[in-house]
Swiss-Prot record:
Pathway: Amino-acid biosynthesis; L-tryptophan biosynthesis; L-tryptophan from chorismate: step 5/5. Keywords: Amino-acid biosynthesis, Aromatic amino acid biosynthesis, Lyase, Pyridoxal phosphate, Tryptophan biosynthesis. Its EC number is 4.2.1.20. SUPFAM superfamilies: Tryptophan synthase beta subunit-like PLP-dependent enzymes (SSF53686). GO terms for cellular component: cytoplasm. The keyword NADP does not apply. Its cofactor is pyridoxal 5'-phosphate. Belongs to the TrpB family. It comes from the Bacteria. The lineage of its organism: Bacteria, Pseudomonadati, Pseudomonadota, Betaproteobacteria, Burkholderiales. This is Tryptophan synthase beta chain.
Length: 399
């Protein structure tokens, strides 16, 4: 096993990551970094975090053998890490609990968040209600339309939802607005970023709170199959569910890590969100990474049937894993993801989020060419209730 200790002291993963923000945010980031570096080694903080994961979220989440599907495909065995069974229905809550506990220790009574699919917004609103905090969630107006049920859920939980009408009206625009709010209300506000992007310490902090996913798998897989899997597959938008399951496996060189980006309507159409496949190195939301850009270096509008993958950048650690060759990245189109969504419902009785359906589609694509003793572990990062309207619309139905 190779040791792995990135990022460095300045928050860099090789040439990626770092801190590229306005001077007005430097004090807040320094304060956050100091608080996090203290809490991450504080046994009482770790105990409280683990207690909440067990009793509030319902962890550990199980690993599950998709046996009927594996048998039907006739190749490798597909296993799911069932993050869809968490309280709030996705992996997002792991990170939100960690950051909310940190906010409480820092004496910040107000939390803000950006959200795409709405899952991070729901998870933030949920933990804000749990700890009695004020909560404001920024969401692109296009995503508000796509994810109406999650918007209502956030409001039920006591959050204020602010629709953002600028740019493509999606996740990147919501992130911009959240940053503006944070600058304005820095004294009493904690910004809970939902993915492994943003300026240091966010990429490593979000990753650390999400690694519970992979840590559990390291224990669970030997219990059920006697060893670790051959492949670990996860969807990548910003990349937090993928980093959560990848990171503990990085030292295990015989385990191949495969991230799955949104190829949208097809890579050749330009209507996709595959930053690692088609982006160039640039700076977005405070860190250096692969960014979807046009010929003038402006951030390009992205497309995916899945709101949570519809982001023009990617976490800097994924950029590093790609360049170093430790992880590979593939693209799955809208149509392939929708087919996997329907098959998963009918064959396994599990309705995955459209984000997770991209990872499942990649596993299904790989399986027939592999021998039956090979094992693919897929991070089923969330459940698909939130995507009912999108899926029905694509099938020409009105709910």
């Amino acid at each position: 096993m190779k040791p792995y200790d990135l990022p460095d002291a300045r928050g860099h993963f090789g040439p990626y990551g770092g801190v590229f923000v306005a001077e007005t945010l430097m004090h807040a980031l320094d304060e956050l970094r100091a608080a996090y570096d203290q809490c991450r080694v504080d046994p009482s903080f770790i105990d409280e975090f683990n207690y909440e994961l067990k009793h509030f979220v319902g962890r550990p989440s199980p690993v599950y053998h998709a046996s009927r599907w594996s048998q039907r495909l006739g190749g490798a065995q597909i296993w799911f890490k069932r993050e869809d069974l968490n309280h709030t229905g996705a992996h997002k809550v792991n990170n939100c609990i960690g950051q909310a506990l940190l906010a409480r220790r820092m004496g910040k009574p107000r939390v803000i968040a950006e959200t795409g699919a709405g899952q991070h917004g729901v998870a933030t609103a949920t933990v804000a209600a749990r700890y009695g905090m004020e909560c404001v969630v920024f969401m692109g107006s296009e995503d508000v339309r796509r994810q109406a049920s999650n918007v209502y859920r956030m409001k039920l939980l006591g959050a204020t939802v602010v629709p953002v009408d600028s740019g493509s009206c999606t996740l990147k625009d919501a992130l911009n607005e959240a940053m503006r709010d944070w600058v304005t209300n820095i004294e009493n506000t904690f910004y809970i970023i939902g993915t492994v992007a943003g300026p240091d310490p966010y990429p490593r902090m979000v990753r650390d709170f999400q690694t519970v996913i992979g840590q559990e798998c390291l224990t669970q897989m030997p219990e059920v199959i006697g060893r670790q899997p051959d492949y670990v597959v996860a969807a990548v938008g910003g990349g937090s569910n993928a980093m959560g399951i990848f990171h503990p496996y990085i030292p295990y060189e015989n385990v191949r890590l495969i991230g799955v980006e949104a190829a949208g309507e097809g890579m050749e159409t330009g209507r996709h969100a595959a930053s690692l496949a088609a982006g160039q190195i640039g700076v977005l939301h405070g860190n250096r990474t692969y960014v979807m850009q046009n010929a003038d270096g402006q951030v390009q509008e992205t497309h995916s049937v899945s709101a949570g993958l519809d982001y023009p950048g990617v976490g800097p650690e994924h950029a590093w894993l790609k360049d170093s060759g430790r992880a590979e990245y593939a693209g799955i189109t809208d149509d392939e993801a929708l087919a996997a969504f329907h098959d998963c419902c009918r064959i396994e009785g599990i309705m995955p989020a459209l984000e997770s359906a991209h990872a499942i589609a990649q596993a299904v694509k790989m399986t027939p060419a592999l021998s039956k003793d090979k094992v693919i572990l897929v991070n089923l990062s969330g459940r698909g209730d939130k995507d009912m309207h999108t899926v029905a619309e694509r099938a020409g139905l009105q709910l």
